[in-house]
Amino acid sequence: MQFANLSGADRKTMQAFLAKLNGQQHRFTVQDHSYTLSGGGGGTLQVNGGTQSGTSLVCDGATASVTNYLKAGDYIAFNNELHMVVADTNSDASGNVTISIAPPIRKTPADDTIVEYTVPKGVFMLAGPASWDTQTDITSSFNIEAVEDVLA
């Protein structure tokens, strides 16, 4: 991630954030700010059944009978896990939907776990040291690399 041309308070906030992470010791939640839902969505999506694993997630609570409820390339999040929808998905007349996802489910979600699809976020950690460049105390640019914490 790049944060360019930060000055004053923004620069100090970023430096404090990075110091607080203490390398890979602490985690942070992040979303893709360029992401927009391309499917129709609607309703309060919840896990339907607490014994799920693999690359499909069965849910209920969707708005009924929506073609392209979620589309390939959309994201969902549950249990602090971020997943990409890999196939277009329709909801049925009862508001049920089966979502094909990648990567596979890592921790079996409990029944009725909320599935976030409008602003999905994942838990990340730094992949290595952060770096920044300051231009004569006017602005700073930061570069950080992060990986999803698959054990969160």
Tell me what each language-model feature is.
Residues 2-152:
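Extracellular/virion structural assembly segments
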